[in-house]
């Protein structure tokens, strides 16, 4: 979503959302639509050895009691390359591993996601993604592949297309034989500053309209999503409100669902604008969840 500005994207990244490598625009040097075929051979799915530049350690608390500790390593492009839990090996989650291929301008052209089950370090590859860009580095196409166990080929799982602003306008998922399983389209409208003002999503008789407002700095202030269906006269409205500090960092996000259940998330940062604390307060939950984040340099 092009209208949600860099500070908001950085918060989500620091809050452990895996990047696709397209959060900033860089001139594209080598990506072409024809580089995204329907199938890939096993030899075409590479696992580059991306080096960790820094680590984020996050601590999850419920009602002030530590319930989980996570380690996440990032490369020097700020993309996550490893995510694992710490603690009792029998209760540990799968370790997630990510490998990236970059063009000369730093755009991600391929990403591979694999898993390892502790204490084993053997990797099982689950997903492979390919990306291509407009000339200015804005993401244009994204194809996700999964491995066919019979043929050993990597086949298209889904495909996304984006407009020149970087907003998703088409999504298609595929069956194992290559036929279309699901399709959705989105029409996007922009304000005079180029911010995404409205997007209308359609698929199989259902629709969803999202409208956005911004402050003078281009930070998103409100997002209102209305969902409806041809089979019903009812519609459902979801609203999210955002607040920022003087440096443009997102400090509060409040979500309200159609039943007036509200969840607020507050964020705190260090002097270099890195996320160090997240506090989730929900009217529909008896559990108070917080996260604390620490960073350490690994290389470079």
Q: Which residues make up each language-model segment?
A:
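Bacterial N-terminal signal peptides that target proteins for export
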Residues: 1-9
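Buried hydrophobic residues that stabilize the cores of well-folded domains
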Residues: 27-300
